[in-house]
Design a protein with these regions (language model features):
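C-terminal transmembrane module of polytopic membrane proteins
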Residues: 146, 215-305
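Basic, alpha-helical nucleic-acid-binding regions used in initiation and control of genome expression
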Residues: 54
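Membrane-embedded transport module
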Residues: 1-43, 57, 62-232
Length: 305
């Protein structure tokens, strides 16, 4: 290493697997070479001589039992049990947390997009309706998505590009088409509700149509939160269950039903009582969000093979 200049070392370092008797400055040089090549680096160590390279790495890992105080202070991660296998568990947990953040963001932005479009294309819902959906219908499922367990293939994925943004890997497209999908279902529900009330297919203000649109949007977003348990995988093949998400969905559904059926709340929101047949139509429309998104996921998986 002493005899190699930087240019020569840059050509050869990727072919070297084992180093012996390296000095602290050599360790830092090795770490920097990998970082300059665009790789995410991790460095473990326990002694004072490891501190410079641990600090230089993207992820500095110190030993909690045998490590010196200097090493622990500069490390990003401290292994409390000095077990290297713990690093794998930490990487898995980090990927799970990042995945869940993306799922919650995608769910909330897709839902908000459908709400905005429902006003942009036609004034189907009023601001107070959208405020209720944002604060009650969307809030609880989004929080529950943050507790989702790691997906089965999470450790088989390639390392994520450190420069990739939160909307990478087609997330922007997913938000757009899912928002448009819910908007389309809500608009269809509005016109069906108006037709069931008047027997006419006309574009006009309709209390029944507005109520059905509200119920459909609320239930569609509740069902869509189930889609977000996995951004690409089928939710029917997940090996785990998110009981908190199911509970949050049930609470949101009960709140939506209450605001439509309790006279005091229904009057404040301008809703009318919904008949069982109308509830059934809203349910059938809103549940379509699951098979349609599953179909798109399947196409996306096929296209990336």
């Amino acid at each position: 290493l002493e005899k190699m200049d930087d240019a020569e070392f840059a050509e050869k370092f990727q072919n070297i697997s084992v180093y012996a008797r390296v000095q602290p400055e050599h360790k830092t040089r090795i770490v920097n070479a990998w970082r300059n090549a665009g790789y995410v680096t991790a460095m473990t160590g326990d002694g004072v001589n490891d501190a410079p390279s641990i600090k230089a790495a993207d992820i500095g890992i110190g030993m909690g039992i045998t490590g010196t105080d200097v090493t622990k202070n500069v490390a990003d991660m401290v292994l409390a049990d000095d077990n290297f296998a713990t690093i794998v568990g930490a990487v898995e947990e980090g990927r799970r947390i990042y995945d869940n953040i993306r799922k919650a963001i995608q769910f909330l932005l897709g839902s908000n997009m459908s709400e905005v479009l429902s006003i942009f294309f036609a004034t189907i819902l009023q601001p107070v309706h959208l405020l209720w959906i944002n604060l009650v219908t969307d809030c609880f499922p989004a929080l529950a998505l943050g507790t989702e367990k790691a997906e089965p293939n999470i450790m088989k994925r390639k390392p994520r590009d450190a420069k990739a943004g939160i909307f990478a890997d087609g997330m922007g497209f997913d938000i757009a088409y899912q928002g448009l999908l819910v908007t389309a279902l809500v608009m269809v529900s509005y016109f069906i509700g108006h037709f069931m009330e008047t027997g006419e297919w006309t574009i006009t203000n309709s209390a029944h149509g507005t109520t059905m649109a509200f119920v459909t949007m609320s239930m569609a977003e509740i069902f869509h939160s189930m889609n977000m348990r996995s951004q690409r995988g089928s939710i029917f093949k997940l090996g785990s269950k998110n009981r908190l998400l199911f509970g949050a969905a049930a609470v949101s559904l009960l709140a939506t039903t209450a605001v439509c059926e309790i006279p005091l709340l229904a009057g404040a929101f301008g809703f009318t009582s919904v008949e069982p047949a109308e509830y059934l139509v809203a349910l059938l429309l809103s549940v379509l969000v699951i098979p349609i998104v599953e179909l798109v996921k399947w196409i996306q998986r096929r296209s990336t093979r």
